[in-house]
């Protein structure tokens, strides 16, 4: 009976450690999947610049193509 208790205790201990490692890996994967704050900042900086340039260039291109200026 004593050896069975030791075995069950060892099994429980190893299972707890294994579960702990799985939770750490899942947390790390979630951190990897989330976009970095710097990436979001870069997108916020360049998107208005590109939109502004497109707003200035598009009417000129449309005017040149349709020739209805």
Swiss-Prot record:
Task: Give the protein's function.
Answer: Antibacterial activity against Gram-positive bacterium S.aureus and Gram-negative bacterium E.coli. Has activity against C.albicans.
Which GO terms fall under biological process for this protein?
defense response to bacterium; defense response to fungus; killing of cells of another organism
Q: Can you say where in the cell this protein is located?
A: Secreted
Family indicated by similarity: Belongs to the frog skin active peptide (FSAP) family. Brevinin subfamily.
Q: Which GO terms describe its cellular component?
A: extracellular region
What protein name does the entry list? Answer: Brevinin-1Pb
Maturation-removed propeptide residues: 21-43
- Which Pfam families is this protein grouped with? Antimicrobial_1, FSAP_sig_propep
Query: Where does the signal peptide begin and end?
Result: 1-20
Q: In which tissues is it expressed?
A: Expressed by the skin glands.
Instruction: Supply the alphabetized keyword list.
Output: Amphibian defense peptide, Antibiotic, Antimicrobial, Cleavage on pair of basic residues, Disulfide bond, Fungicide, Secreted, Signal
Q: Which cysteines are joined by disulfide bonds?
A: 63-69
């Amino acid at each position: 009976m004593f050896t069975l208790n030791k075995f069950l205790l060892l099994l429980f201990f190893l299972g707890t450690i294994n579960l702990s490692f799985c939770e750490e890996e899942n947390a790390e994967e979630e951190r990897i999947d989330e976009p970095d704050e710097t990436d979001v900042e870069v997108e916020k900086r360049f998107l208005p610049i590109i939109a502004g340039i497109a707003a200035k260039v598009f009417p000129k291109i449309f005017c040149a193509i349709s020739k209805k200026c």
